A protein has these predicted regions:
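Mature catalytic core of soluble alpha/beta enzymes
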Residues: 1-223
Length: 223
């Protein structure tokens, strides 16, 4: 699901983006399934989870990287640049041919970014493999902010998962403990991938309506 690196002998999301407006790209069935999930989530969230936002997100990524490397020169991307990029985020321009196992972006200036769903999808696939192929009954594993529980603890109790305090400088490392069995605990917030401009923190979660980083909450956890 990498959008930044190509791999010899493998077509991935980057390959699809590189061929936008040029030609369909043959991909693995799991990439097809991931993109179908993304399209479904776009419909369910009225466009608030749009995997076709790559053109906007890449601008923020570049400014965030530059600002992190040189904080004194950190700046926000110009709104007109973001608005021009936002003209190329129509998810209906993703053409999936399941029979041929290809994906084609009809807009040459469009790009995909599956960061909102890619990690969760991969975690779910690992959990399914562990249960169905390896016969694992009890397991707790974490991939970044995604924690997945298979069954409960071997002693019969639930798994205990701590939710990180978004105020990272606080003496209290966790703000809450939740107990789960056969569930996932997914957390994202403004305290990991961000940069600071004029004393204000700008995170990696972008509001599609404003084209600006979301600032409603410091952290959100979904169980």
């Amino acid at each position: 699901y990498d959008i930044y690196h190509g791999y010899e002998g493998m077509n991935n999301i980057k390959t699809i983006n590189d061929n936008a407006g040029i030609q369909p790209v043959k991909v693995d069935e799991e990439i097809i399934e991931l993109l179908k999930l993304g399209i479904m989530m776009d419909e369910k969230t009225d466009g608030n989870m749009n995997i076709a936002m790559g053109s906007v997100l890449s601008i923020w990524h570049d400014y965030r990287e530059a600002g992190s490397e040189d904080p004194d020169s950190a700046e926000l991307p110009p709104m007109d640049e973001l608005e021009r990029a936002a003209e190329h985020t129509d998810i209906h321009n993703i053409v999936i041919d399941e029979e041929a196992s290809t994906v084609y972006l009809t807009d040459p200036d469009m790009s995909l970014d599956v960061g909102s769903i890619g990690k969760g999808y991969a975690v779910q696939k690992v959990a399914e493999y562990a249960k169905n192929e390896l016969g694992i009954q009890y397991m707790l594993f974490s991939v970044g902010g995604n924690v997945c529980a298979i069954g409960g603890h071997p002693d019969g109790s639930a798994w205990a998962v701590g939710i990180q305090n978004p105020e990272v400088e606080s003496d209290q490392a966790y703000i809450k403990k939740v107990e789960v069995q056969d569930l996932s605990v997914v957390t994202s917030g403004n305290y990991q991938r961000y940069y600071t401009v004029d004393g204000k923190r700008y995170c990696h979660i972008i509001n599609q309506d404003t084209l600006m980083p979301a600032d409603n909450f410091s952290s959100v956890t979904i169980i």
